[in-house]
Swiss-Prot record:
Organism annotation: Sulfolobus acidocaldarius (strain ATCC 33909 / DSM 639 / JCM 8929 / NBRC 15157 / NCIMB 11770)
GO molecular function terms listed in the Swiss-Prot or TrEMBL record: magnesium ion binding; phosphoglycerol geranylgeranyltransferase activity
Catalytic activities: sn-glycerol 1-phosphate + (2E,6E,10E)-geranylgeranyl diphosphate = sn-3-O-(geranylgeranyl)glycerol 1-phosphate + diphosphate
HAMAP family: GGGP_HepGP_synthase (MF_00112)
Cofactor(s) this protein requires: Mg(2+)
Family label: Belongs to the GGGP/HepGP synthase family. Group II subfamily.
EC number: 2.5.1.41
Protein name: Geranylgeranylglyceryl phosphate synthase
Residues bound to Mg(2+): D27, T57
Top-level taxonomy: Archaea, Thermoproteota, Thermoprotei, Sulfolobales, Sulfolobaceae
Record function comment: Prenyltransferase that catalyzes the transfer of the geranylgeranyl moiety of geranylgeranyl diphosphate (GGPP) to the C3 hydroxyl of sn-glycerol-1-phosphate (G1P). This reaction is the first ether-bond-formation step in the biosynthesis of archaeal membrane lipids.
Length: 257
C-alpha cells in the first residue's frame, strides 16, 4: 500500500518523461506456485516493468488474491487490481481500475457491479482509476463472461467513438482489450487515431502482445500503457525481452499531464 493515493500521479510522471509504461498482469487462477512468484516478479522489475496488475476472470478466491498481493507488496512499484467482478477487491492493493465494460449487452458490467463495489472501495480506501474497458476483436474469456458486443479489429471509427464517449463521461483511462491469448493486438492504426482524438486520455492496450515487434508497433502508435499477461505465464524470457523493448523506445506523442 506504499503507493495508495499516488498511483495516478506515478503514471503521469512516467508519461511526462516520454516513456511508455508496462504493466505485468498476474492472473491468480493461473499461479500454481506461490514460492516462485517472488523470483518472477524480481526479474520483471529488473527488466523495467512499472506496475503489477492483478486480476482474472475465473476461479479467484479472496485468500489467494491476498496471498499474491502480500508477496508483491515487497517490491517498490504499485499494485493495481484489474477486477472481473466485485469479489476481486482487496485492501492490500494500492489502486483499482474502476472498469465499465462499455460495449457489454449486460448493464451489470456497465454500471451494476460498480454500484455494488463502490461502497467497498470507499471503505477500504483504494485509489480509483476510472477506466473505460472496450473489448475488441478476439474478446476471449472476458468478452464471453462480460457479454460484450465485440468491436471488430478494423472498425476504427467505432473504437474511436466509444473512446470519445468514455472521455466525455469523465473516464481518464481507456483500456483497449483484444483478449487474453488473442492472435493479434488491437491495430496500431486504431490506437493512433484514438490518441489523436482523445488527447487527454491515457490509452491502455492489452491482448496479443506476444513479440517485441508487436510491442514496438504499439508504442510507436502512441499506446501509453501496454499490458502483458499470458506471455509471462508461458515464456518468462520472452516476456522480459518485450518489457525491455517497450522501455527502450522514446515516445514522440504528447505526455499526459
Amino acid at each position: 500500500m506504499k503507493f495508495r493515493g499516488k498511483v495516478a500521479r506515478y503514471i503521469s510522471e512516467i508519461l511526462e518523461e516520454g516513456k511508455t509504461l508496462h504493466f505485468s498482469l498476474f492472473d491468480p487462477d493461473k499461479i500454481f506456485d506461490l514460492d516462485s512468484l517472488h523470483d518472477i516478479a524480481s526479474k520483471l522489475i529488473e527488466a523495467g516493468t512499472d506496475v503489477f496488475l492483478i486480476g482474472g476472470t475465473l476461479g479467484i478466491s479472496q485468500d489467494k488474491l491476498d496471498n499474491i498481493l502480500s508477496i508483491l507488496e515487497e517490491f517498490s512499484i504499485p499494485l493495481i487490481i484489474f477486477p472481473s467482478n466485485v469479489n476481486l477487491i482487496s485492501n492490500k492493493a494500492d489502486a483499482i481500475l474502476f472498469l465499465s465494460l462499455l460495449n457489454s449487452d449486460d448493464l451489470y458490467y456497465i454500471v451494476g457491479a460498480q454500484i455494488v463495489a463502490a461502497p467497498i472501495i470507499k471503505r477500504i480506501g483504494l485509489e480509483v482509476l476510472p477506466t473505460a474497458y472496450l473489448i475488441i476483436g478476439h474478446g476471449g474469456t472476458a468478452g464471453h463472461i462480460g457479454r460484450a458486443r465485440v468491436i471488430p479489429y478494423d472498425n476504427i471509427e467505432l473504437i474511436v467513438s466509444y473512446s470519445l464517449a468514455a472521455n466525455y463521461m469523465g473516464m481518464k483511462y481507456i483500456y483497449l482489450e483484444a483478449g487474453s491469448g488473442a492472435s493479434e493486438t488491437v491495430k496500431p492504426e486504431a490506437i493512433k487515431v484514438v490518441k489523436n482524438t482523445v488527447k487527454d486520455g491515457v490509452v491502455i492496450v492489452g491482448g496479443g502482445v506476444t513479440s517485441e515487434e508487436r510491442a514496438r508497433n504499439l508504442v510507436l502508435a502512441g499506446a501509453d500503457i501496454i499490458v502483458t499477461g499470458n506471455v509471462i505465464e508461458r515464456d518468462h524470457q520472452k516476456a522480459l525481452k518485450i518489457i525491455k523493448e517497450i522501455k527502450s523506445i522514446r515516445r514522440t506523442s504528447n505526455a499526459i499531464k
